């Protein structure tokens, strides 16, 4: 099954967020939230920069999104979500979570599964033209 190219495009934006975190002295984790193939929020890990243990990449992205309905949204995150972030994604009913890397940190895909939120890890092979 071919992976839609838009997933790679949005993951690249999440990677740019991770790079922004690195530039600020933080951890390299980024996220973007989309609806109708448009980015509606972005964020990166701010745990170190703001001395706040809950400001993971996904949480920063959700915070930027504000009090919207998360129905029909897709979260792209560079690293598999932790229990806190997976719980927030489940609570707000994000429709799909696309994960960039799930080997370094396996995360809590079981939480997403329990709440019926599909999670998909992008293949590590290079994007084909």
Language-model features: where?
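General secondary-structure propensity
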Residues: 2-4, 35, 115
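Short, basic/aromatic recognition patches
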Residues: 3-24
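Small-residue (primarily alanine) positions within well-ordered alpha-helices
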Residues: 14, 18-21, 31, 57, ...
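A short, flexible N-terminal coil/short beta segment enriched in small residues
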Residues: 15, 21, 36-43
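Short secondary-structure junction motifs
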Residues: 24-28, 70-72
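Alpha-helix N-cap and coil->helix boundary residues
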Residues: 28-29, 107
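Short beta-strand scaffold segments in enzyme catalytic cores
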Residues: 29-37
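Zn2+-dependent cytidine deaminase-like catalytic core
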Residues: 41-129
């Amino acid at each position: 099954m071919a992976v839609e190219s838009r997933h790679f495009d949005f993951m690249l934006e999440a990677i740019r967020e991770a790079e922004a975190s690195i530039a600020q002295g933080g951890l390299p984790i980024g996220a973007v939230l989309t609806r109708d193939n448009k980015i509606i929020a972005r964020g990166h890990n701010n745990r170190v920069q703001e001395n706040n243990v809950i400001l993971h990449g996904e949480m920063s992205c959700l915070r930027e999104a504000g009090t919207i309905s998360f129905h029909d949204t897709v979260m792209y995150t560079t690293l598999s979500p932790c229990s806190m972030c997976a719980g927030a994604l489940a609570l707000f009913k994000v429709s799909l979570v696309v994960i960039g890397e799930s080997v370094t940190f396996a995360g809590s895909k079981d939480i997403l599964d329990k709440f019926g939120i599909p999670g998909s890890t992008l293949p590590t092979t290079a994007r084909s033209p």
